[in-house]
Amino acid sequence: MGPAPLPLLLGLFLPALWRRAITEAREEAKPYPLFPGPFPGSLQTDHTPLLSLPHASGYQPALMFSPTQPGRPHTGNVAIPQVTSVESKPLPPLAFKHTVGHIILSEHKGVKFNCSISVPNIYQDTTISWWKDGKELLGAHHAITQFYPDDEVTAIIASFSITSVQRSDNGSYICKMKINNEEIVSDPIYIEVQGLPHFTKQPESMNVTRNTAFNLTCQAVGPPEPVNIFWVQNSSRVNEQPEKSPSVLTVPGLTEMAVFSCEAHNDKGLTVSKGVQINIKAIPSPPTEVSIRNSTAHSILISWVPGFDGYSPFRNCSIQVKEADPLSNGSVMIFNTSALPHLYQIKQLQALANYSIGVSCMNEIGWSAVSPWILASTTEGAPSVAPLNVTVFLNESSDNVDIRWMKPPTKQQDGELVGYRISHVWQSAGISKELLEEVGQNGSRARISVQVHNATCTVRIAAVTRGGVGPFSDPVKIFIPAHGWVDYAPSSTPAPGNADPVLIIFGCFCGFILIGLILYISLAIRKRVQETKFGNAFTEEDSELVVNYIAKKSFCRRAIELTLHSLGVSEELQNKLEDVVIDRNLLILGKILGEGEFGSVMEGNLKQEDGTSLKVAVKTMKLDNSSQREIEEFLSEAACMKDFSHPNVIRLLGVCIEMSSQGIPKPMVILPFMKYGDLHTYLLYSRLETGPKHIPLQTLLKFMVDIALGMEYLSNRNFLHRDLAARNCMLRDDMTVCVADFGLSKKIYSGDYYRQGRIAKMPVKWIAIESLADRVYTSKSDVWAFGVTMWEIATRGMTPYPGVQNHEMYDYLLHGHRLKQPEDCLDELYEIMYSCWRTDPLDRPTFSVLRLQLEKLLESLPDVRNQADVIYVNTQLLESSEGLAQGSTLAPLDLNIDPDSIIASCTPRAAISVVTAEVHDSKPHEGRYILNGGSEEWEDLTSAPSAAVTAEKNSVLPGERLVRNGVSWSHSSMLPLGSSLPDELLFADDSSEGSEVLM
């Protein structure tokens, strides 16, 4: 018959067979009709759909239905619609068919899976949506929904395919359908993508000190797990046995440069990290190309090119200057300056002199050699002094005025004299006339003609060089009479002469007698005033003296000393505070700014010497529950601040003593008033207050630089703060940060450490690991606390180590745990933070190094001019803001940000009938699907700001749980989700940032 009849027979018999199979399946499945065939449970299907439509529209069922009756039972992913037909038969519950549960495949492979459900024909416009990890997948074109209608039910199959899976495709996928306001959810399908190890943290290049230990970290993840790490140094393996990821390599020290890398192995193969170079810090090379940029009579401007920095940033440079004259004493003048901008103007030089100049720069290791010496000369200048001993004579016979003088000292001529300029002014009968005369360089006298008789002549003389005219001498006046003549006028600077010694001795004797007489009279008057305080002592000689009242002499100390002594503090502390005690009458107290368990801070006004009033902050103590030791510590903090003078360290204005109502003296410390309060509260308000304020990253870095400057100043003065935190840093009116609260600070007089000898309340989460163990404090302990403070600033006021109790901190740090990198924190900034938390205090940088690193990072960032330059976007993290003051204000920031550019509307859209998911397209920006937030309480912040606040309190933020470096994270915690501490560290606490324990 040939091949032609075969398709004809198939076309005749297959539809009949198919209808018969459907009828039999329906009869067997009653009263629960199911979709006939193997489609629902298969991972891939090859069946040709009878109907493939976006949605089954236009199909009119013959059955009547009503909504779900209240009180009818239904569970989980099952919807039980109540349908009434002509025969009033109830419909069975609806549910998705069981499908494959777990799919494991390699990276870059393709995968396809589906879910299916049989729905009565009475339900029209039913759609199936795909969800991944609680987020709806929108706009994906590889999701296809197929419909297979029958007489009573329609089988719906939704398939989802990914052409080339990636690690980000890991997750749980489900199907959702809504029927009669009931949501039906399918069983989850778990996709696990396996491949070569993926590095989440690779070793970083470092510059280390010679023979100083340092650590390198390498971390990689699968799946499959486990991932083992091998370390390689200069192409040779360091460890023969692998270490499980993450791995920390401790290098005891190097004497020469080395290259390190790490290898990550799992069952799929091996991945090699980038090679990093570890450089050894060395003394820098001397500067080169020292040149003269400009030269004047008393200054020289030089420039230079810095040499190799020895893998350590330059700190400062020294300019050495010595006179090139062989007759000079050979002394060297040294001028210190910052390393940048490689320019320096040398001042206070002599005019018309030759100098040899050399430059040397230093880094952390030491000073470089001096650059090659260069020769420089200053130019000629005008004389710096006037001629000396100017005298004027009148020669009536020749009708002339003779003038004599002495030339200025040679060193003060500032050049070669070319002559003198004489100014003579003639004044007579209200008429004034000034004339100028020029005299040659060899002259020391001059003669001028009399211009007017019966007049006054005023003469001044100035020396002249090629550099200009020097200052004029003091005026010398002589009167020219009409008849007769004056032959001499006193000089402006008379020459020293001999005086009669008898006259000198007599004058001194008379002076001593006069001084003694004045003292005697003043004492006598004072005594009389005291004796007559209670009566009249000046009676008549013949009167009878009945009672003589004499004022009792008091030998008490001054009131200030007595008040300080009554506090019971040590004599040493009294002497320190004596010169800063302020009269209580000069201070007016105002409202309370803050109050705690042991004291309060009040607003005040301090009267100044010029009559003005200064707004101040006054710290007081509650004497009811304060011991004598706490009072002395309170005043010791004031004594500590007395000698500080730095723009980034709060200064002491004074100490005031006030008698309380119980008659007990109460100390008060007077400090500058800070408009914006402490830094921690300011950061919290910027993030949690209604209508959060945006603080650019550049401003946060400026806060860190200010604190580093203040701590550098304290460290150089051998002071340990021991309580550095954001809450103890204050904000001035110009947004400058000041280090404050020196209640725990200590002065180091010998050595470089301080051992705490008694139990005290300490801020545990800011204390370095060695201080927790041994109660030993150094400046490097303050560096640790500075790193935690930087973390507070970067997170805008979050509490460090959330979920870790105070008594767990030492074990937590001992196991190598540290604060994690905050969201939106630059890698360079986190590296600076992390360097502050090195276990060995010697490995931590100094405050000078930290300041230079932060300034360099701040300079590398662009200036904040518009929203396009903003690096940080406020994500409005969820954190309780209870207890914050109402109506508080923040400092205005010179930045205008369009809310539309910060966050887009997250309002879920209406249900759509076609479910698609665009996955891994070949175009660069269309290769991933879009995740919907899935929260109905979010509103567009631009149109409803109040709704955004509601959403912040009641809904899960989009992206609140995210994946960073292969580990799930949460905004509410800086610890990885799912990670656990050691066995003894399994409990979280609800302590605040001020948590303290007894040490």
UniProtKB/Swiss-Prot annotation:
Subcellular locations according to the entry: Cell membrane
Reaction(s) this enzyme catalyzes, per UniProt: L-tyrosyl-[protein] + ATP = O-phospho-L-tyrosyl-[protein] + ADP + H(+)
Transmembrane intervals: 506-526
Entry-listed glycosylation sites: 114, 170, 207, 215, 234, 294, 316, 329, 336, 354, 389, 395, 442, 454
Tissues and organs where the protein is expressed, per its UniProt entry: Not expressed in normal B- and T-lymphocytes but is expressed in numerous neoplastic B- and T-cell lines. Highly expressed in testis, ovary, prostate, lung, and kidney, with lower expression in spleen, small intestine, colon, and liver.
Leader sequence segment: 1-20
Main subcellular location of this protein, as a coarse class: membrane
InterPro entries documented for this protein: FN3_dom, FN3_sf, Ig-like_dom, Ig-like_dom_sf, Ig-like_fold, Ig_sub, Immunoglobulin_dom, Kinase-like_dom_sf
Keywords: ATP-binding, Cell membrane, Disease variant, Disulfide bond, Glycoprotein, Immunoglobulin domain, Kinase, Membrane, Nucleotide-binding, Phosphoprotein, Proto-oncogene, Receptor, Repeat, Retinitis pigmentosa, Signal, Transferase, Transmembrane, Transmembrane helix, Tyrosine-protein kinase
Keyword Transcription regulation found: no
PROSITE patterns, per the entry: FN3, IG_LIKE, PROTEIN_KINASE_ATP, PROTEIN_KINASE_DOM, PROTEIN_KINASE_TYR
Record PTM: Autophosphorylated on Tyr-749, Tyr-753 and Tyr-754 in the activation loop allowing full activity. Autophosphorylated on Tyr-872 leading to recruitment of downstream partners of the signaling cascade such as PLCG2.
Membrane topology, as annotated: Single-pass type I membrane protein
Function: Receptor tyrosine kinase that transduces signals from the extracellular matrix into the cytoplasm by binding to several ligands including LGALS3, TUB, TULP1 or GAS6. Regulates many physiological processes including cell survival, migration, differentiation, and phagocytosis of apoptotic cells (efferocytosis). Ligand binding at the cell surface induces autophosphorylation of MERTK on its intracellular domain that provides docking sites for downstream signaling molecules. Following activation by ligand, interacts with GRB2 or PLCG2 and induces phosphorylation of MAPK1, MAPK2, FAK/PTK2 or RAC1.
Self-association state and partner proteins as the record states: Interacts (upon activation) with TNK2; stimulates TNK2 autophosphorylation. Interacts (via N-terminus) with extracellular ligands LGALS3, TUB, TULP1 and GAS6. Interacts with VAV1 in a phosphotyrosine-independent manner. Interacts with TIMD4; this interaction enhances TIMD4-mediated efferocytosis.
Associated disorder: Retinitis pigmentosa 38: A retinal dystrophy belonging to the group of pigmentary retinopathies. Retinitis pigmentosa is characterized by retinal pigment deposits visible on fundus examination and primary loss of rod photoreceptor cells followed by secondary loss of cone photoreceptors. Patients typically have night vision blindness and loss of midperipheral visual field. As their condition progresses, they lose their far peripheral visual field and eventually central vision as well.
Name of this chain's protein: Tyrosine-protein kinase Mer
Species this protein is from: Homo sapiens
Origin organism lineage: Eukaryota, Metazoa, Chordata, Craniata, Vertebrata
